[in-house]
């Protein structure tokens, strides 16, 4: 490995650590507050509904999986669903309506007042995530947005904003 390669990897790791430190400082109170609200919603019989595109879709699936299975400790399963997993539903909505509707129609089908809608968009501008939040708000769901860059449209419309102050998709995700 060359010195230039080592320097490049070190710079990437330094950028990651700096982003993580900024995010920790800015989001710690919000994470604690929204964590309590998510616990309360689940205790009242609500569920977590996650969604996003690309890498954010994978994050949505991972989060839902950790809720249903376990995370760090043995515990009963928690109700969660990722709207990114059913290709028949996604492609039929995308084909018959528009890709911007793939999550909002599912929210209207499975979401209920008191549930949690957690959408992810590194830009904060993904039309299908924005529309899903609009649908979730109409139903009475609590909304959590995970964004980067400047937070986009999502920053103004969610109950809780988890904003990573970075323009780098790998750092945001």
State where each predicted segment sits.
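Generic N-terminal amphipathic, Lys/Arg-enriched alpha-helix
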Residues: 1-26
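Glycine-rich, small/polar surface segments that engage phosphate groups of diverse ligands
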Residues: 37-111
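Short glycine/serine/threonine-rich phosphate/pyrophosphate-binding segments
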Residues: 56-61, 125-132, 154
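A charged, well-structured terminal subsegment
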Residues: 109, 116-117, 172-173
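Short, well-ordered beta-strand core segments
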Residues: 117, 143, 161-163
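Surface-exposed amphipathic alpha-helices with a cationic face
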Residues: 133-137
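Short alpha-helices
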Residues: 147-173
């Amino acid at each position: 490995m060359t010195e230039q390669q080592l320097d490049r990897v070190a710079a990437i790791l330094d950028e990651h650590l700096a982003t993580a430190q900024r995010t920790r400082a800015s989001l710690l109170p919000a994470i604690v507050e929204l964590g309590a609200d998510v616990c309360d919603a689940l205790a009242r019989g609500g569920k977590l509904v996650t969604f996003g595109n690309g890498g954010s879709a994978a994050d949505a699936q991972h989060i839902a999986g950790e809720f249903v299975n376990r995370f760090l400790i043995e515990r009963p399963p928690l109700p969660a669903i990722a709207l990114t997993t059913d290709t028949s539903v996604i492609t039929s909505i995308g084909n018959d309506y528009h890709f911007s509707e793939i999550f909002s129609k599912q929210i209207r089908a499975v979401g209920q007042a008191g549930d949690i809608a957690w959408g992810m968009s590194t830009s904060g501008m993904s039309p299908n995530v924005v529309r899903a939040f609009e649908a979730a708000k109409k139903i009475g769901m609590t909304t959590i947005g995970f964004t980067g860059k400047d937070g986009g449209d999502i920053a103004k419309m969610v109950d809780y904003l988890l904003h990573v102050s970075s323009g780098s998709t790998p750092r945001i995700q």
